[in-house]
Amino acid sequence: MKWFPSLLLMGALSMGACQGQTAESSSTTTTEAAASFQNIQVAGAQTMINSGEHILIDVRTPGEFTEAHIDGATMIDINGSDFESGMAALDKSKSYVVICRSGGRSARASQYMIDHGFTKVTNVEGGMNAWLASGYPSVAGQ
């Protein structure tokens, strides 16, 4: 019977140690969930682009980019062999607006950026399709 109080004490300490790990794991999960990109409609994107405080990244193919793109955009083709090196060359402390044709590829590229340490990333919902349908300006060629 002398061992019973010792057993209770060891059990209580073990439970306390496990409880601390759970709290730490929850904190890590919350931090990871907080790291995400923002979505914005084209009107908001135009405001951001015109402010001059954000860098516009177009992740479409060279053919799509040549057909029509937003003036000042930097093309980094998400399906191109130089996508990762193009992203690695960007300054992670800057703010980025990412666009594609319809919003799917730019969402993937935005998540890639977040996963690789970028913190200020905004995806344009609807992409160039929505941009052009709204009558916002574009340019052709490289």
Residue spans of the language-model regions?
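Rhodanese-like catalytic fold shared by cysteine-dependent sulfurtransferases
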Residues: 2-8, 12-51, 66-95, 104-142
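Short hydrophobic beta-strand that contains or immediately precedes a catalytic carboxylate
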Residues: 45, 55-60
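Short, surface-exposed ligand- or partner-binding patches at beta-edge/loop junctions that are enriched
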Residues: 99
